[in-house]
Design a protein with these regions (language model features):
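Glycine- and aromatic-enriched membrane alpha-helices
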Residues: 1-155
Length: 155
């Protein structure tokens, strides 16, 4: 339940201040359902995503950004602060803003992919990206920090 609430909050973050309450609720419901589906898919393909970080924040933020374009209320997008968005809403409506948000999301993913590739290359060259199977089986808390995160007797 807490993950669903976080997913809803992640989804509404891009739209905060640009949608009315019914649209905010809709964004929260759609985002939570989509993130739940992403968590299920992640588990079925055995994708290593601790705490469902990408399934909730990556997917939730993407859905929220896209739904902001579809559901933004023109009256809540001040032309003084967001002239391009206000202009798009005025000339092309929410569909035009949705297309602009798709472009922004694609550009963001591209930027993040390049940055991640650079970081992975550096980390891989300096310390390596994986631990041995034996270390992973023993537990990284013990191997890397010399202590257990949880008392094995309570599990």
């Amino acid at each position: 339940a807490a993950t669903g609430a976080v997913a809803g909050l992640v989804g509404i973050t891009p739209a905060a201040g640009f949608v009315y309450m019914p649209q905010a609720l809709l964004i929260g419901v759609i985002t939570s359902a989509t993130c739940y589906l992403a968590v299920q898919i992640k588990a079925s393909i055995k994708f290593d995503d601790s705490l469902d970080a990408y399934a909730v924040h990556g997917v939730g933020g993407t859905i929220g950004a896209l739904l902001t374009g579809l559901l933004a209320a023109p009256a809540l997008v001040p032309a003084d602060y967001f002239p391009k968005s206000a202009e798009i809403l005025e000339t092309s409506g929410n569909l035009g803003l949705f297309v602009a948000h798709i472009k922004a999301v694609v550009l963001s993913y591209g930027f993040v992919a390049i940055g991640t590739a650079i970081i992975l290359w550096i980390v891989g060259a300096v310390v390596g990206l994986r631990v041995s199977s034996r270390e992973e089986e023993r537990g990284l808390d013990y191997v890397l920090h010399g202590e257990e995160a949880y008392d094995p007797m309570t599990n």
